[in-house]
Amino acid sequence: MSKKALVLLWTAFAACAAMAQVEVTDAWVRATAQGQKATGAFMNLTAKKNTRLVGVKTEAAAVAEVHEMKMEKDVMRMQRIPSLELPAGKTVSLKPGSLHVMLMNLKEPLPVDSHVQLTLMFEDADGVKSQQDLHLMTTLKGPGADSKADGAHQHH
């Protein structure tokens, strides 16, 4: 086997291995009403080794960012975060009212039971970059949602 073929094979193997480094579960996007221009995507992320979520892309919105919500002087604030640490073996939950993927300037409404494709971009502790494509269903409440989560993204 030629040296070039070995390099290509190793690169393909490394990319596949890197893609499998983060398990995504319970992923969903909050459905929108007519005229609504923003919504959230939620999921649980579990990395096999220390990794960071460094970006999100989608065709459904002009802007896709990781956001966090936190209390500052009795006011709940939402802000973009440049990356999200995913410690090895620990599940990081992106959920309403907390960490989440914010989809802004939606190109069209996202009714219940429609599909949204997201691409998550990761970088592990060794600097290896990977991405993972997700096909998410839209719903009003995600798996295991309770009444406290209702409307958490209705005012963006």
Show the residue positions of the predicted features:
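Bacterial N-terminal signal peptides that target proteins for export
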Residues: M1-L9
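Intrinsically disordered, low-complexity repeat segments enriched in small/polar residues
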Residues: L6-V7, A14, K49
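A ubiquitous, low-specificity "background" feature that marks scattered single residues
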Residues: L9-W10, D74
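N-terminal signal peptide c-region/cleavage motif recognized by signal peptidases
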Residues: A12-M19
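Compact, glycine-rich, soluble single-domain proteins
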Residues: Q21-H156
